[in-house]
Each structure stands twice: as C-alpha cells, then as structure tokens.
C-alpha cells in the first residue's frame, strides 16, 4: 500500500514516517524543499507543489492508495494574515482532497486541530458532539477545511489533536522546558487548571490506526492523552527528567492574570491559566490506545 504524506518533514511527520514504514507501507513524502535532516532510507521523496494548485498534485497521486495531510500553517497566534490561513489551510486542503478523489485515492486522513472545535480554554470536557466554536482565524480555517473535505467523494477521516509534546518541539513547550531548567523555584504550584496534551508518538500511532481501521471512515476524532495535567505537574515532570525536584511554590492565579495583562499578553494567560480538557473516548472506543501517563512520558522525554 502506498501512502503519500504532506508535511512529512515536520514535527508529526518524522515519527509518522517511521510508523508507516514499520507497518510495511510504501511511503511517499511530499516536500517543498530538500529535507534536512535526510528522511529515512526507503522513503520516496517527491516535490510538493503549492497546496492551492489541485492540478499540480495529480501526477504525484498516481498509484497512491492513501493520503495523510499534515501540511499547513501552524497556529502561531501572531503575524499571519487571516487570508493566508484560509488560502493554505482551507483552500489548499480542499484542493488536495479533490485531486486525490479524482485520482482514485482510497483514503484521506486530514490532521485538523482541537482549535477547530474550541478556543484556548473551555468550560467543560470537549467531545466530538459539541458544536464547534473556533475563536481565531487558524481554528476557523481548519473547521472550514474539514467541511470542504467531507464535501468531496473521497473516504476521509478527520483528526483533531490537542497541543502536542515530543522531541524537537519548539514554541510553548520549548519555553516551558527552558523555564524548568532554571535553577530557581517557580511560582506555579497554585495553578490547578488542567489541560489535555498529546504525545507526538501517540499522534503518529493514531494516524496509522485510522488508516488500518475502515470503520473510522467518515468520522471525526479528538486525539489526546488519556488524562489531562496541570502546569505544576508538567513542570514537575520536566524537572524530574533533568534530575531535579519540583521546587514549586504558590502564587495566586490573579497575579499571573494581571501580569499577562500588563505586558499585553493575555493570550499567554489563556493558554497557561485556562482549562482545556479534550476527551479521546470516541477514538479509544474503536481500538486506539493513548498515552496513559503524560507526566511519565514528559519525564522520559527530558531524560533521554
């Protein structure tokens, strides 16, 4: 079976290629520039065209049995025009799905985001039956892409992962790692809000699982570790991985909220101080197994 992966050199793409090869698939990686580092031996590297050009994809889809679509503009929070999110994440994804349908591709797995369903915080545990309420251009572009893909004739599965962690991740997780490495006590013991996270390896396993499970066709799934964690638990797990005790002390949450407002970064408080729990039960019910101990997984990650 031949699988074409877009975004193959990215954070999820790297472990996914290994998982697909380990399962015996012939893997084709669509890349926009020569990959660094070089992709695993046996991966067929093909030039990835502009996402918005459906016609340019047709030659690359000949003989392909399944497409895993990872490529897109990530949620950066700043500096990306709304129209750019729509062009790449919605229009580009829809163009690829239409091209795959015309080429007779049998499966299409679209990696969306929990932000297609919710803002950075939610008042209840999210499930797939909730009405989607994205709060930013990134989330709206992903939700619109889901609808456009469903409107094609291709058998598709949509995955909505929460924030991920794993080797090589930058952004917020990397900032927390740098914070955990400081030889200082940290004032986060009082932040008890919980957030769902997702091991990148578990994400790769989820993609492989839905490819191998026909009853997931036509469905949308939240992807998350089994148990949400607090920021205090995350930092304690990180410090355990580098051989330190937690060294956390309490500071009232209101102080963090005021500090974030003072520097014009209320988005930081939304991400760190808000609660976002996403329930992966639907995907688990059809046989997928998540990471059950997020704290231990983070400790292992930093200890490696």
Task: Name every feature range the model reports, one short phrase each.
Residues 3-23:
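N-terminal Rossmann NAD(P)H-binding glycine-rich loop of SDR-like oxidoreductase domains
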Residues 47-91, 99, 116-117:
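NAD(P)H-binding glycine-rich loop region in Rossmannoid oxidoreductase-like domains
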Residues 94-137, 157:
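Conserved Rossmann-fold NAD(P)-dependent oxidoreductase catalytic core, especially the SDR/UDP-sugar
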Residues 133-157:
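Active-site Tyr-X1-5-Lys
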Residues 140, 169-175, 189-211, 218-222:
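Substrate-positioning beta->alpha
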Residues 166, 188-194, 221-228, 237-243, ...:
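Glycine-rich Rossmann NAD(P)(H)-binding loop
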Residues 209-268, 299-302:
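Mid/C-terminal beta-alpha module of Rossmann-like enzyme folds, strongest
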Residues 292-304:
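Amphipathic terminal alpha-helices
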């Amino acid at each position: 079976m031949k699988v074409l992966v877009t975004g193959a050199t990215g954070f999820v793409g790297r472990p996914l290629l290994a998982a697909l090869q380990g399962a015996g698939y012939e893997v084709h990686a669509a890349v926009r520039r020569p990959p660094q580092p070089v992709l695993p031996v046996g991966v067929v590297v093909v030039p990835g065209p502009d996402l918005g050009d459906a016609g340019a994809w047709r030659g690359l889809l000949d003989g392909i049995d399944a497409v895993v679509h990872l490529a897109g503009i990530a949620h950066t929070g700043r500096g990306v025009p709304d129209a750019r999110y729509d062009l790449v994440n919605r229009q580009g994804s829809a163009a690829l799905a239409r091209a795959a349908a015309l080429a007779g591709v049998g499966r299409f797995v679209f990696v969306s985001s929990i932000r297609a369903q919710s803002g950075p915080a939610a008042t209840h545990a999210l499930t797939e039956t909730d009405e989607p309420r994205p709060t930013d251009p990134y989330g709206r572009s992903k939700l619109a892409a889901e609808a456009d893909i469903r409107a094609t004739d291709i058998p598709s599965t949509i995955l909505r992962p929460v924030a991920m962690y794993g080797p090589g991740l930058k952004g917020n997780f990397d900032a927390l790692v740098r914070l955990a490495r400081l030889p200082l006590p940290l004032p986060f013991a009082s932040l008890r809000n919980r957030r769902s996270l997702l091991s990148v390896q578990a994400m790769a396993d989820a993609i492989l699982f839905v490819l191998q499970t026909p009853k997931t066709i036509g469905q949308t799934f939240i992807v998350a570790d089994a148990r949400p964690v607090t920021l205090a638990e995350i930092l304690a797990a990180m410090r355990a991985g580098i051989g330190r005790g937690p060294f956390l002390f309490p500071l009232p949450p209101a102080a963090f909220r005021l500090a974030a407002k003072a520097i014009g970064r209320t988005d930081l408080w939304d991400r760190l101080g808000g609660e976002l729990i996403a329930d992966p039960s639907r995907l688990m019910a059809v046989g997928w197994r998540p990471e059950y101990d997020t704290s231990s997984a983070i400790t292992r990650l930093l200890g490696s």
